[in-house]
Swiss-Prot record:
Gene3D superfamilies: 3.30.70.100, Superoxide dismutase, copper/zinc binding domain. Residues 4-67 form the HMA domain. It comes from Debaryomyces hansenii (strain ATCC 36239 / CBS 767 / BCRC 21394 / JCM 1990 / NBRC 0083 / IGC 2968). The keyword Cytoplasm applies. Pfam families: HMA. Cu cation 1 binds at residues 15, 18. The gene is CCS1. It comes from the Eukaryota. Belongs to the CCS1 family. Cu cation 2 binds at residues 229, 231. Its main location: cytoplasm. GO terms for biological process: copper ion transport; removal of superoxide radicals. This is Superoxide dismutase 1 copper chaperone. The keyword Isomerase does not apply.
């Protein structure tokens, strides 16, 4: 059984009706032990064992967007954006996201979502190196194998809500698929930072078309209350709009 952890989301809300809608969406999820909705700060906090991607999807079903602002205790979370290095995907390379949260000593959960891939079983693994100079081929030996991921849900508007990447509009309907898995690893967050995650169609092997990305530390719950980026001067929602244009959906 997955241990409980805290997640903080930024959600644009204007009135009590917005709060009620978000509250109803959270009540429908099994595994959330408690939640708090702060209208003034536009923040939603949950505690439980539900994958972050599923909570994002539930909130977005109300018509509101949701951005994860922090997960777990300080220094207990990481993130990895999975990209394709295949030339045919150059216009939209982002295909997946792994959110990693420590729920105990040597106990991690990995919320892995992918979108816009051929149907089939894929094999994610953590690699020893974070060198992406040759895509997945330069990430080194396997550091830790994760469980297989079934990619079998046809791409649709609902899959792009809580995933990264999107099917090209020129692709025939039904030819690309999405998948989501809640995986476990007997590791610590400190073991992972700077390494990489790959997603391969081949078990125990890396292929040129394998997705890959570097694992980076991410904010714990309440460690990121930024509303405006000090570098760009843009709000989180302006940055969100730019990310959406590049295929980033959550």
């Amino acid at each position: 059984m997955t241990k409980s952890f805290e997640i903080v989301f930024a959600v644009p809300m204007e009135c009590q009706s917005c709060v009620d809608s978000v509250s109803s969406s959270l009540k429908s999820l099994n595994g959330i032990s408690k939640y708090d909705i702060d209208l003034k700060s536009n923040l939603v906090t949950t505690e439980g064992s539900v994958p972050p991607s599923e909570i994002v999807k539930a909130i977005q079903s109300t018509g509101k967007d949701a951005i994860i602002r922090g997960t777990g205790a300080p220094n207990s979370a990481a993130v990895c954006i999975l990209e394709s290095f295949d030339p045919k995907d150059i216009q939209q390379p982002v295909k997946g996201l792994a959110r990693i949260v420590s729920v105990g000593a040597n106990d991690l959960v990995v919320d892995l979502t992918v979108n816009g891939l051929p149907q089939g079983v894929y094999y994610p693994s953590i690699r020893k190196s974070g060198n992406l100079s040759k895509g997945a081929l330069s990430t080194g030996e396997c550091f830790y194998p994760l469980g297989p991921l079934e990619v079998d849900q046809p791409v649709s508007e609902s899959t792009t809500i809580n995933s990264l990447g999107a099917a090209s509009p020129t692709v025939e309907e039904g030819s690309l698929y999405a998948g989501q898995g809640f995986l476990h690893a007997d590791l610590n967050i400190s073991d992972l930072i700077g390494r990489s995650v790959i997603l391969s169609k081949l078990k125990d092997k890396t292929a040129p078309d394998s997705l890959c990305g570097v694992i980076a530390r991410s904010a714990g719950a309440w460690e990121n209350d930024k509303q405006v980026c000090s570098c760009s001067g843009k709000t989180v929602w302006q940055e969100r709009s730019e990310a959406l244009a590049k295929g980033l959906k959550s």
